[in-house]
């Protein structure tokens, strides 16, 4: 037996007696060993032997529960609790239970919000996405301008293809604008300043800043 284990065994009676009195609930020797082994380094044989000795000395109570021995503090050492005191304790338990449930619900809400924010684009990613969309839109505007300027040289099939692509990209425009709006709204929920200040700080420019409106479908 190591020196630390020997010292723990020597003080086992005091440790176990104090533990049962503080917890004031029934335990098997296995429960006591599992709960105290890491903190005090008590071996299982020491725990079993010490509990039996404490029971024989009348310092704790022992009771058979099936094939297992259960140990608990002698209840005679505790003051009697009146019905009024029990009602007060019950009230505190109800209040604390409600508080715990409220805190758990708040934790679930914050975890869900954190998960949503973690999956959103970062500010640099949003800025990059916006620049790419601007570049893409500028290319389509230039292409459409050239097509309109050369109307007499466009076949009906080419014209139909262009308008189909226009509808496609307008739809994508709306989709991406909606996504960008939702992401910025999510960020603004925890942002201490106004939406306008946020856009100015990160360099976000909107369609409205340039009086650009989405074409009709």
UniProtKB/Swiss-Prot annotation:
| UniProt keyword terms in alphabetical order | Coiled coil, Disease variant, DNA recombination, DNA-binding, Meiosis, Nucleus, Phosphoprotein
Q: Which InterPro entries does the record match to this protein?
A: Hop2_WH_dom, LZ3wCH, WH-like_DNA-bd_sf
Q: Write out the tissue specificity statement of the associated record.
A: Highly expressed in testis and colon.
Gene Ontology annotations for the cellular component aspect, listed alphabetically: condensed nuclear chromosome; DNA recombinase auxiliary factor complex; nucleoplasm
Q: Where in the cell is it found?
A: Nucleus
Where is the region DNA-binding? 118-182
**Gene Ontology biological-process entries:** homologous chromosome pairing at meiosis; meiotic joint molecule formation; meiotic strand invasion involved in reciprocal meiotic recombination; reciprocal meiotic recombination
Q: What is its main location?
A: nucleus
Q: Which residues form a coiled coil?
A: 93-153
How is the protein altered post-translationally, as described in the entry? PTM: Phosphorylated by PKA, PKC and MAPK.
Tell me where on the tree of life, at the top rank, the source sits.
Answer: Eukaryota
Return one GO MF term: transcription coactivator activity
**Induction description:** Overexpressed in leiomyomas compared to myometrium.
Q: Which family does it belong to?
A: Belongs to the HOP2 family.
Question: Which disorder is recorded?
Answer: Ovarian dysgenesis 3: A disorder characterized by lack of spontaneous pubertal development, primary amenorrhea, uterine hypoplasia, and hypergonadotropic hypogonadism as a result of streak gonads.
- State the function annotated in the UniProt record: Plays an important role in meiotic recombination. Stimulates DMC1-mediated strand exchange required for pairing homologous chromosomes during meiosis. The complex PSMC3IP/MND1 binds DNA, stimulates the recombinase activity of DMC1 as well as DMC1 D-loop formation from double-strand DNA. This complex stabilizes presynaptic RAD51 and DMC1 filaments formed on single strand DNA to capture double-strand DNA. This complex stimulates both synaptic and presynaptic critical steps in RAD51 and DMC1-promoted homologous pairing.
Assembly notes:
Interacts with the DNA-binding domain of the nuclear receptors NR3C1/GR, ESR2/ER-beta, THRB and RXRA. Forms a stable heterodimer with MND1. Interacts with PSMC3/TBP1.
Its protein name is Homologous-pairing protein 2 homolog
């Amino acid at each position: 037996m190591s020196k630390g284990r020997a010292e723990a065994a020597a003080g086992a009676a005091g440790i176990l007696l104090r533990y049962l009195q503080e917890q004031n609930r029934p335990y098997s020797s296995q429960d006591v060993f599992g709960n105290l082994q890491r903190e005090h380094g008590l071996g299982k044989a020491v725990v079993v032997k010490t509990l039996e000795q404490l029971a024989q000395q009348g310092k704790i109570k022992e009771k058979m529960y099936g094939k297992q021995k259960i140990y608990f503090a002698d209840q005679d050492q505790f003051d009697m609790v009146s019905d009024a005191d029990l009602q007060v304790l019950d009230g505190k338990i109800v209040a604390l239970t409600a508080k715990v449930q409220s805190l758990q619900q708040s934790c679930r809400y914050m975890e869900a919000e954190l998960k949503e924010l973690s999956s959103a684009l970062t500010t640099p990613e949003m800025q990059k996405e916006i620049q790419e969309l601007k570049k893409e839109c500028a290319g389509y505007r230039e292409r459409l301008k050239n097509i309109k300027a050369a109307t007499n040289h466009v076949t009906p099939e080419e014209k139909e293809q262009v308008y189909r692509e226009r509808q496609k990209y307008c739809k994508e425009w709306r989709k991406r604008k909606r996504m960008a709006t939702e992401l910025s709204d999510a960020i603004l929920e925890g942002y201490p300043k106004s939406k306008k200040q946020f856009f100015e700080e990160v360099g976000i420019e909107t369609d409205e800043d340039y009086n650009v409106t989405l074409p009709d479908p």
